[in-house]
Amino acid sequence: MKVLSFIVAAALLGLTGASSNSSPGLLKSDGVVLGDWESAYQKASSFVAGLTTDQKLALITGSSVNSTNGSFSGLTFLDGDMGLQNFFYVSAFSLSSALAMTWDRDAIYAQAKAVGSEFYNKGIQVVAGPTSQPLGRTPWGGRIVEGFGPDPYLNGLASGLTAKGYIDAGVIPGAKHFLLYEQETNRTGGGGGGGGDSGSAPYSSNADDKTLHETYLWPFYDAVKHGLGAVMCAMTKVNGTLSCQNSDLLMKHLKTELGFPGLVWPDTNGQSSALESAVNGEDYGSSSIWSTSTMETLLSNGSLSEARLDDMAVRNLMGYYYVNLDNGLQPEEQSEDAYVDVRGNHSKLIRENGAKSMALLKNKNALPLRKPRVMSVFGAHAGPVLGGPNTAMDIEGSGPTYQGHLATGTGSAQASLPYLVPPYVALTNRIIEDGTMMRWVLNDTYSSSSTSGLITEGTDSTAVDPSFADYATNSDACLVFLNALSGEGADRTELYNDDQDTMVNTVADNCNNTIVIINTVGPRLMDQWIEHDNVTAVLYGSLLGQESGNSIVDILYGDVNPSGRLIHTIAKNESDYNVKICYTAQCNFTEGVYLDYRYFDAHNVTPRYPFGHGLSYTTFSYSDLNIEKPSTLSKYPTGEKAVGGNSDLWDIVGNVSVKVANTGSLDGAEVPQLYLGFPTAAQQPVRQLRGFERVEIASGKQSQVTFQLRRRDISYWDVPAQQWLVASGDYKVYVGASSRDLKLNGTFTVQTSS
């Protein structure tokens, strides 16, 4: 996404309020209560009421406005969740998928606030994030690394916390990509995944109303509830209509049902018609399609109403006033190479969150490392890329792995690394302290040469034909580093890699303590070597940002006890996943709500590692399940229409609590997870995540964990009624350490009244 300039208010004079609108999707229509957005609405509508038509058109097309009401200067959008893109003296944070793997509300919020503060201090007003979609419908999706994972509940909480963090830093959150944007292939038509216009139509994501609400709209409810000020409509189609001119999506669902008060702006090439976009819900544009002269014509011939123009103008200013950018305190916008260092102490946060996100999937007492005498390191992912740290990474045409340490995304998800600590550097710093001898092959395929050699035990010469086997032999620990690359512009072509898997097996054949470390953009299969007797541990994570190597080494040596959890299921075979990349113009979401673990559970497919899985260096036990069931509830919500949907959806209607004890010898953090099974009549998945808490517990101590159930957590979408319905009947309660490791279970019964 490019930097876009549009209008912001630099001054406000006392003006009368604008009258309320009466058409669905217009602010103040259908009785949507704005709550704490009311002050922003009064300021924005008063300002717009004093503008001429030409000035309103200037406002929604990105031109400056000078009037008796005050002056407007450019407000900018910029990627993204991982930090400011293409700027000097900024931080490169973990990607959203890594942050979600912490399962830590505080960590998610803290990073968002830190990212937001860097945007604010560089003079940028809008973060193009949170990236609520791609959700992760298919593990082959090229951009799923940018989001919070395929579970709507986890994704929603993370989206909401991210929006709140940006707001508290003083900038406007702009969620993307709305809606059902789940792959790169054919996103611009003609089979391409690039950002340019291919000259033919993009694919259409076709989903039924139940799937739309229970899976893909769900995270946006959370983001809107927590103060979302902008939404980027996707460049693709939904149910046959382009997202940026889709009235059902923008006017009905987003602006009316969810009560979204902010502006909608298009992704690159998301606009194809000014009229269709304007009347159906888009509020801002800067392309030649959305020009002042075009909009004037639409007004003059009656195609575009004055009421809708006013609504667009007001919405362009809602987020600006909501986060108090009108107070004049934000620093002026800086050039990309300006020496304005906004990083503060964020490197510490990045390192901590990176370590929190790493999931220990397997451990045969190999970790933590205990001052190994000889350690060998393998894989390109362990060391730096030859030129760096920043390279212009255009994923289209790139290979499935990265020849260097992969710590940030590509395209819109590529952070500006001020430096990068690869594992090789972090390990070197550690072994100097410990007196360890380290050997390395920083490549995934190794061709020997007569000019390279290895000092071997029992000889005073060097081997003339060294190999992975030579380096692995006589090592106390062998660390094998793997990565998987994808990103904007192209989908994944594989979920495992032959070269890397051969490397693992070769090392393991010659080293009885082979530890595999993976940083990946999505599910990475490992059945090619996971059952090898000498593969003793697997550490698994996403892309961790500038402190990546330090975060990994903190876990390897036990300075941090691992607590990360999977946000996707790792299958045994590619064929175990039910959704592949769609190569046709019509992409039918026939799987419905059955993504990831929901599909595996429904079809009794045994995963290699389940959703929510992650080990620790200590052990935990669960006991004392207690359920405070909901009282009698109305079948449908009866609250007011509000920002974030019907106000009743957010009511706390019940609680589930358990005791978790640390039964091991080390302090550590556990992530107990709550899953619900709905009454049979609701026709829902076997289990759905409906609560989690990351709790730090000292050795020998215990903690009581309480999960609050909101009304929406026990509701499903009633298509005929077009409302969220609470089913009468028995709900099954499961609490455990993953979607398959369920320690405790119970039931509660809900009675509903009409």
Curated annotation (Swiss-Prot):
Q: Which domain of life is it from?
A: Eukaryota
Task: Tell me the compartments it is located in.
Answer: Secreted
Q: Which residues form the signal peptide?
A: 1-20
Chief location of this protein within or outside the cell? secreted
For this record, the Gene Ontology CC terms, alphabetical, are:
extracellular region
What keywords were assigned to this record? Carbohydrate metabolism, Cellulose degradation, Glycoprotein, Glycosidase, Hydrolase, Polysaccharide degradation, Secreted, Signal
Q: In which pathway does it act?
A: Glycan metabolism; cellulose degradation
The function of this protein is:
Beta-glucosidases are one of a number of cellulolytic enzymes involved in the degradation of cellulosic biomass. Catalyzes the last step releasing glucose from the inhibitory cellobiose.
What protein name applies here?
Probable beta-glucosidase D
